[in-house]
Amino acid sequence: MIQHIRNFSIIAHIDHGKSTLADRIIQFCGGLSDREMEDQVLDSMDLERERGITIKAQTAALHYQAKDGKNYLLNLIDTPGHVDFSYEVSRSLSACEGALLVVDASQGVEAQTVANCYTAIEQGVEVIPVLNKIDLPAADPDRVIAEVEDIIGIEAKGALRISAKTGEGVDQVLEMIVAQIPPPEGDVDAPLKALIIDSWFDSYVGVVMLVRVVDGVLRPGNKILLMSSKANYLCEEVGVFQPKAVSHKSLSAGEVGFIISGIKDLKSAKVGDTVTLADRPAGEPLAGFKEIKPQVFAGLYPVESNQYDALRAALEKLQLNDASLHFEPETSQALGFGFRCGFLGLLHLDIVQERLEREYDMDLITTAPTVVYQVVLRDGKITEIENPSRLPDLSSIEEIREPIITATILVPEEYVGTVMTLCTGKRGIQKNMQYMGRQVMLVYEMPLNEVVMDFFDRLKSVSRGYASLDYEFKEFRAADLVKLDILINSDRVDALSLIVHRASSQHRGRELAQKMRELIPRQMFDIAVQAAIGAHIVARENVKALRKNVLAKCYGGDITRKRKLLEKQKAGKKRMKRVGNVEIPQAAFLAILQVDGK
C-alpha cells in the first residue's frame, strides 16, 4: 500500500495560482462534488479568501486512478507563499517527498519562489516545475523556463504548461506526481512515529493534531505519548481531510492525517513534536523544527480599559491556532493596560489585528511596530529589549546592537537603480548582484527596523510592483542608536518612543513633531509637542488653542476693559492646561511609520 502513496505540496510566490491549482486537483480527483466546490477551497478563513492569500497550511487526501490502472493516494499539503509565513512552508515540506513549484508564466520567478524552492531542495524534496497561467496573453513560457534554470538552477526544459483556471494540463500534473515523486519510506511494523506538522483548537473536540505518520500504525483506543512533554493521552479518533474531515479505522506509515485525543491545551501538542505509543515507544524522536522567534513587536491596547480581560481571552484563543503569536501584559502611562505582542512580520501583525477586530469585536489601539534590540550594559550583561520605552539609562549602556537581515530582492533590470537607491537610504550594504535574463538579483544586508517601517511598500512603489523581497535574520550588530522620545506638554508618551540611528535622529524628530501637530486635535489650551533625545530637545511644534472671541460683546469702549477680559481668558487657559488631558488619536501612534528617516 505504501508504494501507492504520494505526499506533495505546492510552493509558489503569492498570486502565482497555488490555491487555484489545489482546487483543480481536488476537483479532478473527486474530493468534493461540484456543488461543494468553491474557489480557494483550502483557504478556510474568510480573511484568506478576501486577501487572496493562504495563511495556514491545509491538507487533502485524494484518490486518483492513474493511466497505468493503479489507484494512488495523493496527500496534498497546501502552503502559504508570503515571507511572514515561510516557517509554515518548511513544516509542510517536511511531511512531503515532492513539491510542485508553480511559477506564473507571465510574472516569472519571484523572490519567494526562490526561497521556498531552496527550502524544498535543502529538505531533499523532489521539485517538479509547473508553469501556470499559460492562457494569459502576456504569458512567455520560454523566458520563464530560462529564468527557472538561471535563478533557481533546476532542470525545467520539460516543465508542464498548465492553466489552473481553465483546468488545462491538470491531468498531466497528476501523472507527473505519480511518476516522479517517490513513495514515502516507512515500516508499518516498527514502533509508531508521527510528526506533528500543525495543531489547532476545535471548540468541540479540543486540540486537533495534523500528523505525518513515518513508521507504525495508530488506531483509536491506543494510548499515545508525546515525546517532548512525556504526556500520555488516549487516542479517540484518527482520520484524513478530503478536504472535509473523514474518520478512519487507522493511520499507517506514509499517511498524513489527524489525531484527536481530548487535549485541552495547545502548548501540550507542540508543532514538531513526535507522537508514539505509550506501551511501545519509539527510541528516538524525529527531527523537529526550529522554534520560531517573533521578529516584530507591537503594543495592543483596548480603547476601553474594561475590555482588558476580553482582549486577553481573545489573544489566548488566537494563540491556540497560531503558535507563532507571543504576548505578555504591559502597562503604558499613556494607554493604560494592554499587551506587548510578538509577530513574524507586518502582514502577520495586520492579520492578527484584523482577526481580533472582526472575530472578537475588539476596539484596539496599536502602537507602531518595533524590533528586538540587544543592549550590552557596562557591567557586561546582555539584555534584549523589544519596547523602546524600556531602554536603560544611556550612561549604563556600553553598546546597542540591532538585528541585521539578509534581503534578497528580485527586480526587472529597468528598476535596479531606484531599488538600489532605496536600499542604500535604508542603511543597506550591497553583498551581491547577479543579472539573470531580464531580472536582477540583489542581495543586501540591512537593519530589520528599517525594513519594518515602510520598506515593503516603498519597494513596490519604486519598482511599479515588480520587485519581490525575501529576507532572513543574520545577526545582531552594534550600531550608533539613540532613543527618541515624544513629549506632549512636557510629559513623555512612552507608547511613542522609538529607537533610531543617530544620523537620522534629528530629521526623524522634526518630522514626527510636525506629524503630531497635524494629528492631535486642537484643545481649549495650547499643546507643546517636543521630540527629545535624552535631555536634549531636537524639535518643537505647537498645537494652537481654540479660543472664544471674548471681545465680541465690547463695542468700542476702553482698552483696559478689553485687556482685563483677555487676561482673564489667558489665566483660565493656563489653569486648564495644568489639569487638562490631551487625547491622542490612533493615527498619531502609527504616524511613526509614515515618517521617513532619510
From Swiss-Prot:
Binding site for GTP: D15, H16, G17, K18, S19, T20, N132, K133, I134, D135
Entry's Gene Ontology BP terms: positive regulation of translation
GO cellular component: plasma membrane
Catalytic activity: GTP + H2O = GDP + phosphate + H(+)
A Pfam short name: GTP_EFTU_D2
Enzyme class: hydrolase
Cited SMART domains: EFG_C (SM00838)
Gene3D superfamilies for the chain: 3.30.70.240, Elongation factor 4, C-terminal domain, Elongation Factor G (Translational Gtpase), domain 3, P-loop containing nucleotide triphosphate hydrolases, Translation factors
InterPro entries registered for this protein in UniProt: EF-4 (IPR006297), EFG_II (IPR041095), EFG_III/V (IPR035647), EFG_V-like (IPR000640), EFTu-like_2 (IPR004161), G_TR_CS (IPR031157), LepA_C_sf (IPR038363), LepA_CTD (IPR013842)
EC number(s) on file: 3.6.5.n1
Single Gene Ontology MF annotation: guanosine tetraphosphate binding
SUPFAM superfamilies per the UniProt record, alphabetical: EF-G C-terminal domain-like (SSF54980), P-loop containing nucleoside triphosphate hydrolases (SSF52540), Translation proteins (SSF50447)
Keyword Nucleotide-binding: yes
tr-type G domain boundaries: 3-185
Keyword Cell membrane set for record: yes
Family under the similarity heading: Belongs to the TRAFAC class translation factor GTPase superfamily. Classic translation factor GTPase family. LepA subfamily.
Protein name: Elongation factor 4
Naturally occurring in which organism (per UniProt): Nitrosomonas europaea (strain ATCC 19718 / CIP 103999 / KCTC 2705 / NBRC 14298)
Gene, per the UniProt record: lepA
